[in-house]
Design a protein with these regions (language model features):
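Short helix/loop segments within enzyme catalytic domains
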Residues: 58-65, 144-170, 207, 214-216, ...
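Hydrophobic, aromatic-rich membrane-embedded alpha-helical segments
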Residues: 54, 181, 187, 223-239
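Alpha-helical transmembrane segments of polytopic integral membrane proteins
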Residues: 24, 28, 52, 121-134, ...
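Central hydrophobic cores of alpha-helical transmembrane segments
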Residues: 45-50, 269, 314-318
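Cytosolic-facing loops and C-terminal tails of multi-pass membrane proteins
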Residues: 2, 93-132, 155, 159-161, ...
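Alpha-helical transmembrane segments of multipass membrane proteins
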Residues: 29-33, 226, 297
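Peri-catalytic and regulatory segments of divalent metal-dependent proteins
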Residues: 118-220, 262
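Hydrophobic membrane-embedded segments
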Residues: 1-125, 139, 143, 147-165, ...
Length: 323
């Protein structure tokens, strides 16, 4: 396959998958908009499916082979021989023709392919920068020696049924509790605010991070991140990543509030104390990345009505069928 065919095939597939993702994202947005009682776990799965559709549609291409009907017999054309009369033809002068369309398509397709590869490279370089930053934070973090914190952590992990609890460390480089690395996970606490955190706040913060661990969010987050890298130019990819991350945080907030020991207003005060902080990927912080996300999380705490559980599985399966 030459470079022109490769560029045309990849660009056409990017366009087709992008249009499909636009329709699917519109459907998911309408469902989340007009079903406010839909639980956060289902919302997270729906946006994860939007991102997965983009990745799978791009990397896995299997055209459906349709059976062809046999061609109808075509009557042979009747050739009538006619006497040719002598004629004199003037040979036209050769003129310079226009630039072939293949050359123009070659230039456009290859340039677009190069631009797409450059964009993916920029996204990958930014991700590697975050990974290197997180690696430095984990390397410089020290083991937690506070007996109060260790006792609360062990009791909470035992009550939640976490058999292999992540190593608990303290870091001077973070502002919020953070669960880092999908492999050999580490739970880091900010050294600046650890001494001033009460037992209830510390227990809720640890519960939130352990909820991420139980949900395996660090592993599932790779699919939306991959869609954002491959479709960096598509607004739906960024929307799916943002809404999936928000629904994921709300699901962990709901897991904390399901514990009868914690009240919504107490947890809301903790979210305000944690404030706004960004975590390098792959890591999950208890703080909100933006003030808008913090406001949305606080508003979700006000929903005291029970979420819609019935039909959530059927809804997810329906979205899978449409994807």
């Amino acid at each position: 396959m030459d470079l022109v065919a490769l560029a045309d095939g990849l660009l056409s597939r990017l366009l087709a998958v992008g249009l499909q993702a636009l329709l699917l994202a519109a459907l998911v947005w309408v469902l989340c908009r007009y079903l406010p009682r839909l639980d956060a776990r289902t919302r997270a799965w729906l946006w994860w499916l939007v991102a997965s559709q983009m990745v799978v549609g791009l990397v896995w291409y299997a055209p459906v082979a349709l059976p062809l009907l046999p061609a109808e017999p075509v009557a042979a054309p009747v050739v009538v021989a006619m006497a040719a009369e002598p004629a004199t033809y003037a040979v036209p002068a050769m003129a310079a023709g226009p630039v072939p369309a293949t050359q123009a398509r070659f230039d456009t397709g290859v340039l677009l392919l190069a631009a797409w590869l450059a964009g993916v490279a920029v996204m990958l370089a930014n991700t590697l920068r975050h990974v290197w930053r997180l690696h430095g934070q984990v390397r410089h973090a020290r083991p937690c020696r506070d007996r109060r914190v260790q006792a609360l952590y062990r009791a909470l992990a035992q009550r939640l049924g976490v058999a292999a609890a992540p190593e608990l460390r303290v870091s001077d480089d973070i502002d919020s509790p953070m669960l880092a690395r999908p492999w050999r996970p580490v739970l880091m606490l900010p050294a600046s605010s650890l001494a001033t955190m009460g037992d209830d706040d510390l227990r809720m913060a640890l519960h939130h991070e352990l909820a991420h661990l139980q949900r395996r969010d660090l592993w599932w987050a790779w699919m939306p991140a991959l869609a954002q890298h491959l479709f960096f130019f598509h607004p739906v990819a960024h929307l799916a990543v943002r809404e999936y991350a928000f629904a994921r945080e709300v699901a962990c907030d709901a897991a904390v509030l399901q514990d009868e020991q914690h009240a919504p207003h107490d947890y809301g005060r903790l979210l305000v104390k944690l404030g706004v902080s960004t975590a390098p990927s792959p890591a999950l912080a208890g703080a909100s990345p933006t003030f808008r996300i913090l406001k949305r999380r606080l508003l979700m705490l006000q929903q005291t009505a029970s979420p819609l559980r019935a039909g959530a599985l059927a809804l997810t399966l329906g979205i899978v069928a449409l994807a």
